Amino acid sequence: MTFANPITRRSMLKAGAASAAFLAAPAILTRPGFGQSSGTVNVFVWGDYVQQNMIDKFQKDTGIKLNLSTYGSNDEATQKLKASGGKGFDIIFPSVTNVANYQDGDTFLLQPIDETKAKVGNVIPSMYRDSIQLGAVQNGDRVAIPFNWGTEAVTFDSTVFEGAGDADVSYGMLWDPKAKGKAAFRQKSVLIGTGLYLDAMGEVQSNRMLDVYKSEEDMRRVFDKVASYIVDHRENFGAFWNNATEALNAFQQSGCVAGQTWDSTGLLLNRDKPELKYRMPKEGGMTWMDSMAIPSGAENLDQAYAFINAMLDPEMAGLMSANTGYNSCVDGAAANAGEVYARQFAEVYNADNLANLWWWQPDTPFFASGQQEYVDRITNAS
């Protein structure tokens, strides 16, 4: 993949768009529900994705009342939908690699997307294409539409790690003596980040952590060594986090000076305190894609498609990026995201580190439960 210079979100994501242009067709002729003056849509979403300015715009533009419920992890969302038998919500936002986990016995809890009703042509073609491999298609049906993408990388206090240039940033900073008692991380993610660090150092061979998806034996071989390294450095544990608020609090209230965080956390911290920097580590930023899906028991389908189409509008998608720092999968969103967004993107990303991103893979049958065992080992060591 090649990149224009200077690099932008748009130039990076549109690479390969010509070869996948067919994905933008057929043109969407209708926008069911959009602009109607009544109805309700029940949305279950990550806590910071749909903020008040987006709610106000949606309700004003459509006349549809938006009932918002939020969650902080894929596990929480999956468990909630399984408990309700797929009912109670019209829209949910699963990470695309987590979509397969909505299989509940013989029932799949997400329904096929009617691509004649959703403005899928607004999605960046390469993102729409790549989402297939990541899990958006199940049992031959597309069940998820790309919504946004982002990274989980390293946030650090540059006054503590004085002299550290962008090329020096590493997941290993969490285990540096300078971060003693002040390292923040999500346990499931630190297994990957530290694994990438140890792989790069030649201490744990893992095929850049892809072996943990290969087989249960390989997963345990790698995670055993990575978890042992983390536990051996438990004096650096400062704060665990499982959602955006907890990650912010780790730095703002608990005094952490280094951590693995989502991009939204790192960029928001940087806006308030410039010495806190969010950067891609040399081992590669961990990358995810979230999506929009319709639960099998959704009751308000017209309103659900109206909501999807509103989120796929470049202006609305730009609001999401400006609010959160996350990157939209909608073509044209970046032009509506504002100067702060553009500036921070240029500070964090370049052609080299974008080419070095590490993508979360679709969960394999043994992965989630096996990973949880090592999460528990780390948690219990604190």
Regions found by a protein language model. Name each.
Residues A351-S382:
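Conserved C-terminal helix/tail region of periplasmic/extracytoplasmic solute-binding proteins
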Residues D224-H233, D272-S296:
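Periplasmic-binding protein-like
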Residues M1-S11, A18-F22, P26:
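N-terminal secretory signal peptides
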Residues F89-P94, F240, V257-W262:
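Paired acidic/hydrophobic, glycine-rich loop segments that form the ligand-binding mouth/hinge
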Residues G35, M286, D290, P295-A355:
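Mature extracytoplasmic/periplasmic domains
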Residues D75, V96-G238, N242-E246:
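Extracytoplasmic ligand-binding site segments that recognize negatively charged/polar headgroups
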Residues Q36-Y102:
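Early extracytoplasmic/lumenal segment of secretory-pathway proteins
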Residues N98-Q103, Q260-E275:
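A ligand-binding cleft/hinge motif common to bilobed small-molecule-binding domains
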